[in-house]
């Protein structure tokens, strides 16, 4: 009787391990490809403001580099900076609003190359968020890779170049690109637009008031992308 019971139990276990549901679950886990991550950093003049003695721009650069280095092996990372040319006066608006610099194209993370790509850039001009999102979309369109597609937009302000970032974020979401927004020491009046960008982009809006806040957000996101 005991022999028969053991045989039945073993048969049931074997069936469970070879069932279509188990096989599908195993295949899905094994087949999950690394993510493709684009970080868009605001280099408008207001990012020069210092918090605890460090400019918001430099704080953001440091935390973005730590975030990129913590991503799972095989993750394709891209870094763009927007508004880094011209100046934040009317005389420099046209140049600044056209300034989307793809400083680190989609590739695996290399710390030295990543840091070098940002060495000569500082906070200068206006805030062309829509154009930066559109440039990210074009980069994803040219990327031949599997895995989820995720954008992290870090800014301290709203669109100032006449674009429509909410409409653009919606276009990214149609292409299955998730848009997350980090509002870094932003003016309260900008929250509506930043939150709307994340909402239509299928992502989340994260308020950050200090470098420590930015660090916590990126740590959380790195853990999520590692699952």
From Swiss-Prot:
* SUPFAM superfamilies registered for this protein in UniProt: vWA-like (SSF53300)
UniProt xrefs under CDD domains: vWA_ywmD_type
Q: Which residues form the VWFA domain?
A: 36-227
Is Ion transport included in the keywords of this UniProt record?
no
Name the UniProt key words of this record, in alphabetical order.
Signal
Listed Pfam families: VWA (PF00092)
Q: Tell whether Nucleotidyltransferase is among the UniProt keywords.
A: no
Q: Where is the signal peptide?
A: 1-23
Top-rank lineage group of the source organism: Bacteria
Instruction: Supply the InterPro entries for this chain.
Output: VWF_A, vWFA_dom_sf
**Similarity annotation:** To B.subtilis YwmD.
| Name by which UniProt lists this protein | Uncharacterized protein YwmC
Q: Which organism is it from?
A: Bacillus subtilis (strain 168)
- What is the phylogenetic placement of the source species in the record? Bacteria, Bacillati, Bacillota, Bacilli, Bacillales
């Amino acid at each position: 009787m005991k022999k028969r019971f053991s045989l039945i139990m073993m048969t049931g276990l074997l069936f469970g391990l070879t069932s279509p549901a188990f096989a599908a679950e195993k295949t899905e886990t094994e087949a999950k490809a690394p993510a493709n991550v684009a970080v868009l950093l605001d280099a408008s003049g207001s990012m020069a403001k210092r918090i605890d003695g460090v400019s918001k721009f430099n704080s953001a650069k440091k935390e973005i580099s730590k975030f990129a280095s913590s991503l799972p092996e095989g993750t394709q990372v891209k870094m763009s900076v927007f508004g880094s040319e011209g100046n934040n006066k009317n005389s420099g608006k046209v140049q600044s609003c056209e300034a989307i610099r793809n400083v680190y194209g989609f590739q695996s993370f290399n710390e030295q190359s990543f840091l070098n790509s940002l060495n000569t850039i500082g906070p200068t001009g206006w805030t062309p968020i829509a154009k930066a999102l559109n440039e990210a979309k074009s980069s994803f369109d040219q990327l031949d890779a599997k895995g989820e597609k995720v954008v992290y937009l870090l800014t301290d302000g709203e669109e100032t170049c006449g674009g429509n970032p909410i409409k653009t974020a919606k276009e990214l979401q149609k292409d299955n690109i998730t848009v997350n927004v980090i509002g870094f020491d932003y003016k309260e009046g900008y929250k509506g637009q930043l939150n709307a960008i994340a909402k239509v982009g299928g992502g989340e809006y994260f308020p950050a008031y200090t470098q420590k806040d930015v660090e916590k957000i990126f740590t959380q996101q790195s853990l999520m992308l590692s699952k």
